[in-house]
Amino acid sequence: MSQQYTLPVTLPPALSQEPLKPVSPPADTQQEQVKQATPLPAPCQKMLSELPVEVPLEDAEKHTTLVKGVPEQECEPQPQEPQQQELHVEQQQQQQESQVQELHVDQQQQQQESQEQELHVDQQQQQQESQEQELHVDQQQQQESQVQELHVGHHQQQQESQEQELHVDHHQQQQESQEQELHVDQQQQQQESQEQELHVDQQQQQQESQEQELHVDHHQQQQESQVQELHVDHQQQQQESQEQELHVDQHQQQQESQEQELHVDQQQQELQVQEVQQQQQQQQEQQEDHQKAEHLEQEEAQREQQLKGQLEQEKKGVYQHLDQELTKRDEHLEKKGEHCWSSRRSL
């Protein structure tokens, strides 16, 4: 079950010997109360009343020394050393007491947290136990229902085996049902196998009964044939006619099968011929495509050659024209130069 955990706390010797006292306000508030309790001289009180409200008390005490006509000694409070020492001692005691109380509160909080954790753990354990109990109850119910189903199936199988007088199969089924109680998961498969075995046994019994009936009929026929020896020729003729009919039927079936095989062979040959024709057509199309591609390449090559020739001829014509213009310009410049030279000489 749950266990309580306590934390060790060490206190100073002075605090461990002194008893706990009620909580008192902090030291800052006590100092303010002491400061408010100490009366000031009349001039200082007047100046404090004239100061604004928002100025702190310490600043107000500083401002009291700056008043004209008032000596500094009058504004200073009377020294109270023994009272201050007592206040200091009380403040220390109160601080120590508050620390002790805080430690006590921390211990209580820790104890409460540990108790809450233990309660939470206990609740979880209880929930798990209840869930496990529910699962156990569900499993028991499932097992009981499965056992009941097994019992019903077993009872039905016993009735069927008693009706069919298959004692050996019934003994096997009892053994298998006992094994099925240990293997609940394999119950359906084993039941199906048992049903199949029963069905096979029934079929075997039916076959055996039919064979027995056939055997009896055959025996009766033999007896009748022995008694009816007069009708032997007729039976032989009937048998021969039946054999002939069978032979004719077989011959017809063979012919039909041969014709079907020939028809299948013809269809296969036609398919082969069609495939060969398709292959030939594909080859011809490929050859034609190849020839077309070669023809197009030749035409493109011829066009390129023609274009190259035309470009070369045009280049030659352009070059010739440029040469002619350059020669004309040179001749014109030479004529101009000669004319200028002659004019200069004349000058």
UniProtKB/Swiss-Prot annotation:
Where is the stretch described as Disordered? 1-43, 56-347
Q: Does this entry carry the keyword Hydrolase?
A: no
Name any Gene Ontology BP term: keratinization
Composition bias type Low complexity, residue spans: 70-114, 138-161, 222-241, 265-285
Against InterPro entries, the record matches this protein to: Involucrin-like, Involucrin2, Involucrin_CS, Involucrin_N
Output the superkingdom of the source species: Eukaryota
Could you tell me where the Basic and acidic residues compositional bias lies? Answer: 164-173, 212-221, 287-341
Expression by tissue? Keratinocytes of epidermis and other stratified squamous epithelia.
Subunit comment: Directly or indirectly cross-linked to cornifelin (CNFN).
- Family membership noted in the UniProt record: Belongs to the involucrin family.
Mind telling me what this protein is named? Involucrin
| Naturally occurring in which organism (per UniProt) | Sus scrofa (Pig)
